[in-house]
Amino acid sequence: MGKIVCLMGKSSSGKDTIFKELLQEGTLGLKTIVPYTTRPIRTGEIDGVDYHYTDESGFQQLLKSGKIIEERAYNTVHGLWRYFTVADESIQLEDNDYCMIGTLEAYVHIKEYFGEDKVLPVYIEIDDGERLQRALNRERSQTEPKYEEMCRRFLADCQDFSEEKIQAAGIKVRFENERLDSCLLRIVQYIQMNR
């Protein structure tokens, strides 16, 4: 197939859970593109698995070397946090299929870099009330909860994933994550049909 499945959706829509389930799903054989970030590691996250954690200096070195495919920067209440995708030796589309999590903006840049025929968008959505509750539950479980940042992210997602931006990115198929098992089944079928 040689495709990149790009999971997108607002924070706490279930992307991380679906991502992990897709990687474990036996018939798809997806590998992961691990993104990079300058934000602090969260409780339970693993460097090189969830993200490649770096600092601003590391980001600038990758930028100068021309390896950054796409990047987003967020002025958080804790400072500037960057998230970015790097063209490194781990991406071998001629040999493998991949799965990654990104924003609409990231999807557009990935599509431009690799070609539209190589990138399969999977947009996950959920009721905002449920999403806010999930975000709160996740933040409560952190050693040092960052509630102010959680609220900022929730509100920013309403703009970053506006209906106009979803349509402008060319997203035609959406997956409602009301129940994980049925949502996951629909996504697996969608990937299999679009190989």
Question: What is each model feature region?
Answer:
Residues 37-98, 102-104:
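ATP-dependent small-molecule kinase phosphotransfer cores
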Residues 13:
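ATP-binding Walker
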Residues 16:
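Walker A/P-loop
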Residues 140-191:
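Small-molecule kinase domains that catalyze NTP-dependent phosphoryl transfer to phosphate-bearing small molecules
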Residues 7:
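Hydrophobic anchor at the beta1->P-loop junction of P-loop NTPases
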Residues 10:
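P-loop (Walker A) phosphate-binding loop of NTP-binding proteins
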Residues 97-103, 114-137:
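Conserved phosphate-donor/acceptor-positioning beta-strand/loop module used by diverse small-molecule
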Residues 24-33:
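Post-Walker A helix-loop "phosphate-sensing" segment adjacent to the P-loop in P-loop NTPases
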